Structure formats: C-alpha cells, structure tokens
Regions:
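Bacterial Sec-dependent N-terminal signal peptides
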Residues: 21-41, 106-125
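Solvent-exposed, low-complexity, repeat-rich "mucin-like" stalks and linkers
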Residues: 34-62
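Surface-exposed binding patches on compact interaction domains or structured appendages
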Residues: 52-83
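A short beta-strand micro-motif common to beta-rich folds, especially ectodomain repeats
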Residues: 82, 93-105
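N-terminal carbohydrate-binding accessory modules
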Residues: 118-190
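An active-site-proximal structural segment forming one wall of the substrate-binding cleft
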Residues: 126-127, 170-191, 201, 205-234, ...
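Active-site region of glycoside hydrolase catalytic domains
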Residues: 251-387, 396-416, 439-442
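Substrate-binding cleft of secreted/luminal carbohydrate-active enzymes
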Residues: 385-463
Length: 480
C-alpha cells in the first residue's frame, strides 16, 4: 500500500511539473496584440480614419464590404498605423462593415458604421445640427493648427494698394487652395484663421471688401476640405482694450463683428467665431503689482468683452443664433480659466467653449535658446521629469476645473521658439503638449507660421516624424 501511495505521489508531482513547464512555455510564446480603436462611425461622405496595431507584427485584413478598405499608413517598431477608407454612401440606409484583423494567432474584429445618404439642397458647410453640443464639436475638431502670421499681419509700412500685400508681409506666400488642402491631407481636422480686420478699415469702421472676400475664399477652401474653421480678431489689442470704457471703441468692435456675422451668417457648425486674442490690462493689474480690486477690474473688463461679443453674434441673423463660439480668459493664460473672477458669458444658445493659450515654460516656448531678456534666459532643451510634471499638472487643472464641469476647452495656440534648438527637442515639446491636451478631451491647435513645421511651398511637413508622432495621438486616444 505504501508503495502505491509513493508511486501516486511521484506521478502527481511529475504531472504538475510538466503542466507548469508547459504553462511557462506557453506564456513565453504568448504575444499580446492590441488593436485599437475597434469601432468607427463615418459620415455619409466617407473618408479615412486611422487605427493602430501594437506591437508591429505582420497583419492581414478582410473586409466584409467592398466599400470599406484597409491600407497601410506608417509604422515604427512599436506600432503599425493603418487607414480605414470608406467610400461615400449613396444609399438611403445606414450601412455596416466588419474588418477582420489577423495577427499571428490573434483575431480581432473592427466594426464600421456609416451614415445614410439624405437628400438635401443644403451643402454640409451650411448645416446646423440642432442637437450638436459644443463638446461634441470639440471632439470632431481633432487636431488643429493655425494659419499664423498671414491674414493677421499688420504694419504701417505695408503697401495698402493690394490686400495680398498684407498676406505676404510676414513671410507667407499667397495662400492657395493646395496649401489649405495640405493641412487636411496631413490629418488636421481644424484650422484657426487669425485676421486683422483693421487693415484698410474705413473711418466709419467698414471692413475693406477685398479683405472680406479673401477671408471667405480661404474659409471656403477650409470647409470644403472637411475641416472646422475658427475666425477671430487678431493683433488689435490696443483699441479693443478700450471697448469697456470708450464708446467709440465699442462702436468699432460692434461694427466689425456685425459685418463678420452678416457676411458669414449662412455658414453652419464648422465655422466658429472667437472675439479677440490675448487681451490683458497690465496697466491696471499684473500678478506682480496691483490690488485685488485692480485684479477684479482687469478681469471684469475681459468678462465684459466676452459678453458683448456673445450678444452681438446672437442678435445677428442666420445661423449665428446657434453658432458655436469661443470666449477668452484674461490674457488667455491658463490659470485664469478657473479664477473665481472669471465669468462665463450668458448665452441663450449654450454653445460656448473656452480658448486658452499654452506657452509654458516661457523661457522655452517664447524665448529662443540662449536668448537673454530682463526676465530670463532662453533654455535650449525641454523634457526633464519636472517639465513633464508641470505640463501634466497644468492640463489636469484645466480638465478638473473646466472640462469635467461641462466647459469645453480649446488650446488655441501652443508651440516653441525654434531658434538655437534641435528639431528633436521642438518635436518632443510639441508632441508632448498635444498629447497632454488631446488625452484630456480638449482640442489642441498648434501655432504654426511661415518657416514653421508646415512648409507652405511644398504643402508638406518638413519633419515627417513630427507629423507621424502627432497623428498617432488620436489613434492612441480614440473619441466617439
């Protein structure tokens, strides 16, 4: 009996060892494959959207429908990026496709849904969706970029005989349809178009018709690419600051915005208005000088400007009654977004978002490397543990105090001065800031100018890795 028990124990032990060895062997062979996102919704017009496979392993794809196809986009040793391209839906029914992804032993299905074709006499760029919230629109805006130093160029030395002289004054070529299409082809979903409307403004505050025509032409190129556009008043702070206290300045502000509203009243959800740019009252209050009463006065003036802007737009005609609008915080500095003295305007349409600019740390984002000014010296690099902590802490504050409380946020400008810095450190900063913004449900809009990241001569990005890393962010953080 003892011998049988001993044999049983030895047999059991041997089986257990073999099982564990097999399990360990299987664990070593097991490769975790991640395919994301696994569901997509396309509008009736079709288009392309990206998904990723991590790690980068050979994959095969089978689509259940001929109108839905997969093509390779880009790859790194860590991740492969693919495009799902969907043809326009010409049927009156919602349609669905299943893409079967096979990577070694791993099989994953991606579900694709496309909206039905609805006969309409109204082009999409004129459409207002009644139930579209501003937060949902922010999601649609994806990654954004600025057409900077172009329609916003100013200077009394500029020849006023042709409006295009202003457009080229700060180094930009004349904007073409191909330049605008290049942003969309690169993957950007929204374009901010800063405009200095004071160029050639008449004494009775009438916008020059050539400027109005030019803005509308560039706007139409933008909308026809499927992008969302933002138009503002830029570089006119000296007189705009006087609006709360000077009747003539208020008349000028009101006149310009009424003309903008009238000209663009037919455009729909894909056009947003922004009242001004980086307005502050340093002569009244700064964080380093002035009393709490002075601060309340300075921030109150910006509140007044926002409310005046909303009132003008809402009381104008056409689609402006339900247009999604941006409002600004003091100096567009992040910390004033959640300052108790900042007040969101009253808006009967409830279609407002905050716009914030992010140039932190200032001695990297604003100054060139080694540049010396009275308040500091420009850093040549960025990317320490402390740098990332500062970035994430700032974006966490915005999310906690605004996004999580139902206030949508756009980071309307961010970038870094490239002087005396490598493209690698500029790329690291811009991509890191973009990811920190996007991952928290906000819309990042890179400040880009002639000679910046996007080459307006070739209509491509000079640093392909910059674009590749940027476009991997929406794949990493899919939105509904």
């Amino acid at each position: 009996m003892k011998i049988m028990v001993q044999i049983f124990k030895e047999t059991l032990l041997t089986s257990l060892i073999l099982f564990l060895m097999t399990a360990c062997s299987d664990d070593k062979k097991e490769l975790k494959i991640i395919v994301e996102p696994t569901s997509f919704h396309f509008e009736q017009t079709g288009g392309s959207k990206k998904f990723g496979i991590t790690p980068n392993e050979p994959a095969t794809f089978q689509s259940s429908e001929a109108w839905c196809k997969v093509t390779s986009e880009s790859s790194t040793p860590v991740q492969a990026i693919y495009n799902i391209t969907v043809e326009p839906n010409t049927t009156p029914d919602v349609r669905n496709a299943i893409i079967t992804v096979s990577v070694k032993e791993h099989v994953q299905e991606i579900n694709v849904e496309q909206a039905a074709y609805i006969q309409s006499d109204e082009p999409e760029k004129y459409t207002v969706r009644e139930n579209l919230t501003t937060h949902q629109l922010i999601n649609e805006m994806g990654l954004g970029i600025n057409l900077g130093n172009t329609l916003d160029a100013v200077g009394d030395w500029i020849d006023p005989s042709n409006i295009l002289n202003y457009e080229q004054a700060w180094g930009s070529p004349i904007i073409t349809q191909e330049i605008i299409e290049g942003y969309a082809k690169a993957g950007y979903s929204s374009l901010r178009i800063p405009v200095s409307w004071g160029n050639l403004l008449s004494d009775d505050f009438k916008v020059h018709p050539d400027l109005m025509d030019r803005v509308e032409k560039i706007l139409n190129w933008t909308l026809d690419c499927g992008m969302v556009a933002i138009i503002n008043i830029h570089h006119e702070n000296e007189w705009i600051k006087q609006v709360p206290t000077d009747s003539k300045a208020k008349e000028k502000f009101t006149s310009i915005w009424k003309q903008i509203c009238e000209r663009f009243e037919k455009y729909g959800d894909h056009l947003l208005f922004e009242p001004m740019n980086e307005i502050g009252y340093d002569e009244i209050w700064t964080p380093w000088s002035g009393s709490e009463a002075d601060k309340a006065k300075a921030l109150g003036y910006v509140n007044d400007l926002n409310q005046l802007f909303v009132d003008i737009v809402r009381n104008s005609g056409g689609n402006n009654a339900k247009r999604h609008l941006l409002v600004e915080i003091y100096n567009t500095n992040l910390e004033y977004a959640y300052d108790p003295l900042f007040k969101m305007p009253n808006d009967p349409a409830n279609r407002l978002a905050l716009t914030v600019h992010y140039y932190t740390p200032a001695n990297f984002a604003i100054l060139g490397g080694g540049e010396v000014v009275d308040w500091g010296v420009g850093r040549e690099s960025w990317g320490t543990e402390a740098d990332f902590k500062e970035l994430n802490d700032n974006m966490d504050l915005l999310k906690k105090n605004c996004v999580d409380k139902g206030i949508p946020v756009i980071i309307g400008e961010y970038c870094a001065d490239s002087r005396n810095r490598t493209k690698e450190v500029i790329r690291l900063f811009c991509v890191s800031v973009t990811e920190a913004i996007y991952s928290r449900g906000m819309c990042p809009m890179l400040w880009d100018t002639p000679g910046g990241q996007y080459n307006r001569q070739t209509c491509q990005f000079d640093d392909p890795l910059f674009l590749e890393e940027m476009m991997a962010i929406p794949v990493k953080y899919p939105r509904n």
